[in-house]
Amino acid sequence: MVDLHPTGDHHPETGARLAALLAAFNPELEGGPASVEAIERVHDGEYVARVAALGEESWLDGDTPAGPTTWEAARLAAGCAMRAVEVGGFALVRPPGHPALPDRGMGFGIFGSAAIAARHAQAERGIERVAIVDWDVHHGNGTEAIVRDDESILFVSLHQWPYYPGTGGPDTSDATVLNIPLPAGSGDAAYANAFRSLVEPTLRSFDPELLIVSAGFDAHVDDPLASMAVTAAGFREMAARCTQLCPRVAAVLEGGYNVATLPALVEASLEGFAS
């Protein structure tokens, strides 16, 4: 996945992100590519076939390059996410998944790896209720579009607002979706308060058997793509709270575009998940 799915010299989502993480952590397990059947649990078959057939470098939207090796990279990302829910691990993958809509890619995303993993757990592992907590700085519009009408999956998104992709604003929550829009400049205290007052009671009421974290790190104070102020300690605290709310937790890498800080932020989250 490091060298698959090339995005060009000036795109923020590059293989250098994953290379830095693999060098730092030397993961013990590898996942194989997701099957077409698994991907089509969340994506339209016509869109899946279009990605599989890409024969030259192109763009799925103005932000999302794709080419002949994108199919392999996106299948591996989804397959690693599926493996993570089986073993309670953290899937270090690219490209990100949470912006991808059922019928098209967008926002750097090709396939919704977290949603694919959730449906895999339900179809193949006997899990009934799954929660997805997304702390990437961007609203997880793709994941929401996939699961909004599914009462067996709760989606929670904490994100900068207003900001790309322009969804997930105030008054957009319902029985299966909790959107928590936060203003630019929000840091550890704001996220901790949101967890205490909104995320925790909602998760306790839903009582998930599995919690999947869409772990983006672009809300970090030094990330170049956004304007939030979360620190490593803030990510550690959110991860720890997730483990307190569900006995079975897995995580999938989403955004985070400062290659120099990304390994430390993932490490902080791993410490929280292990606490």
Residue ranges and their predicted role:
Residues 1-275:
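HDAC/HDAC-like amidohydrolase catalytic core signature
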